[in-house]
């Protein structure tokens, strides 16, 4: 028998868990957090288009207008547009020659 074979052959005791304190609450908490992180990462990679599309359109919608009279909706739209128009005047256009 060669020396290499003897080195690679595992002893039965080495197959067991060497962590005697695996019931430590910190180890358990770290394991749970690691598993949850892995699950969330997998879900994010699988459904990232749906998730980010929802957030992108959800943030652009603005406040809900249910139960608001049409005249108040129109007034709100005009205020929003005037705020956008006022912000446009702050930009400086630079022309390159």
Curated annotation (Swiss-Prot):
A lipid is attached at residue 50 (S-palmitoyl cysteine). Glycans are attached at residue 20. It is found in: Virion membrane; Host apical cell membrane. Changing residue 30 to P: Almost complete loss of channel activity. Resistant to amantatine. Keywords: Disulfide bond, Glycoprotein, Host cell membrane, Host membrane, Host-virus interaction, Hydrogen ion transport, Inhibition of host autophagy by virus, Ion channel, Ion transport, Lipoprotein, Membrane, Palmitate, Phosphoprotein, Signal-anchor, Transmembrane, Transmembrane helix, Transport, Viral ion channel, Virion. The keyword Transport applies. Residues 71-80 have a biased composition (Basic and acidic residues). Residues 60-88 are annotated as: Disordered. The chain crosses the membrane at residues 23-43. Homotetramer; composed of two disulfide-linked dimers held together by non-covalent interactions. May interact with matrix protein 1. This is Matrix protein 2.
């Amino acid at each position: 028998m060669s020396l290499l074979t003897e080195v690679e052959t595992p002893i039965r005791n080495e197959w067991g868990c060497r962590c005697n304190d695996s019931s430590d609450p910190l180890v358990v908490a770290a394991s749970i957090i690691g598993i949850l992180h892995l699950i969330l990462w997998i879900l994010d990679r699988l459904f990232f288009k749906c998730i980010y599309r929802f957030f992108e359109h959800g943030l652009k919608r603005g406040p809900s207008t249910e139960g608001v009279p049409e005249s108040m909706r129109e007034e709100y739209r005009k205020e929003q547009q005037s705020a956008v128009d006022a912000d446009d005047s702050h930009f400086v256009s630079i022309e390159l020659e």
